[in-house]
A protein has these predicted regions:
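Short coil-to-beta transition motif at edge beta-strands of beta-rich domains
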Residues: 74-88
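Short beta-strand-centered aromatic/proline hotspots
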Residues: 95-105
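Short, basic/aromatic beta-hairpin or loop at an interaction surface
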Residues: 48-65
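Contiguous surface segments at macromolecular interaction interfaces
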Residues: 1-49, 107-172
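Short, flexible beta-strand-to-coil junctions
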Residues: 88-92, 144-145
Length: 172
């Protein structure tokens, strides 16, 4: 799929397919189970349970392709078109979904951040205000579920050592 488009343009044009070559940086982002459940409800522990079809338990933003991730990481190398892999920490210790970065910003300003993430996040306005009490990394991305989960054992075989506790850039 080398059509002259960058990875973000390719994703938009060919979704669910995406570009992955040497020019595309990759990052692994740890995410705690409760936040993973909110951001990616299709991987919820409720799936297959009695309450799976109870839509009141899920926010509409959780069921979108366009999403936002907020954190206090100081990493500054993530850019538009990069691939981000979400590592569900603590319970599953695996990667089940990924995203292609649409935009990145650092801010403490609710007037700048809220319009950018309002329809992409599961957070309430008051939650966002609390998060923004210090400089926040905001990653806007397009979500893609992986066909197959990547286990912690597979991650270790890929030379990703140690506990995954902060955003890490991966080598190609």
């Amino acid at each position: 799929m080398d059509d002259g488009c960058n990875s973000l343009e390719s994703l938009i044009k060919y979704y669910p397919y995406f570009k992955d070559n040497e020019s595309v940086q990759k990052f692994i982002i740890p995410i705690q189970p409760q936040f993973h459940e909110d951001l990616f409800p299709d991987f919820s522990n409720m799936k297959g349970s009695l309450f799976e079809k109870d839509q009141s338990l899920y926010s509409c933003q959780g069921n979108t392709i366009k999403k936002a991730y907020l954190c206090h990481s100081k990493i500054k190398t993530i850019r538009k078109g990069d691939i981000i892999l979400f590592y569900r920490s603590k319970d599953r210790k695996s990667i089940q979904c990924m995203g292609i970065v649409e935009d990145v910003l650092f801010s403490e300003n609710i007037d700048e951040v809220f319009p950018a993430i309002a329809k992409r996040t599961v957070y309430k306005y008051s939650d966002i205000q609390n998060i923004l009490k210090k400089r926040t990394l905001v990653i806007l991305f397009r979500y893609k579920a992986l066909d197959k989960e990547i286990s912690r054992q597979q991650i270790a075989k890929a030379e990703i050592k140690g506990n995954i506790q902060s955003i890490r850039q991966l080598s190609n």
